[in-house]
């Protein structure tokens, strides 16, 4: 579903409902993300760069792919929704000085309403994966 930028996030602090799915087809496990998630949230390597607006250690850990159990593990961006770019909160950067010596704010943050979105999507993704794995285990134990 579309999210109206005038209603979602800052400055209105509005909450929206979205969707995250975990699917197993044979040996393939798929996690859908309702936006464009930064690869380091999926694969690891989140940094805490100098100049970030929110000074914190990486929050979106462990990497989501590490919590998947398929032989082939895939993440599909823009799965069922588009809530914006999902940047790690420790890399959130709208105000100078900018990270990585950039002269302007990085591209992604202007398209998401709130820096808390990526930690929420990460945590919910872990919970959805856990439910998938519990369901698969209960089916295999029959």
Describe the role of every protein-language-model region.
Residues 1-142:
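Non-catalytic substrate/cofactor recognition surfaces at enzyme active-site rims
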């Amino acid at each position: 579903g579309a999210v109206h930028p005038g209603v979602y996030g800052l400055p209105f602090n509005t909450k929206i409902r979205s969707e995250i799915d975990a699917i197993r087809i044979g040996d393939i496990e798929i996690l859908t993300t309702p936006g464009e998630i930064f690869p380091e949230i999926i694969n690891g390597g989140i940094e805490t760069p100098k100049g970030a607006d929110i000074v914190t250690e990486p929050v979106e850990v462990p990497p989501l792919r590490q919590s998947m159990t398929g032989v082939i593990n895939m993440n599909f961006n823009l799965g069922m929704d588009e809530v914006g770019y999902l940047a790690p909160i420790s890399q959130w950067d709208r105000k100078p000085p900018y990270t990585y010596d950039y002269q302007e704010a990085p591209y992604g943050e202007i398209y998401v309403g709130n820096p808390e979105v990526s930690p929420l999507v990460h945590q919910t993704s872990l919970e959805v994966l856990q439910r998938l794995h519990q369901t698969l285990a209960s089916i295999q134990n029959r």
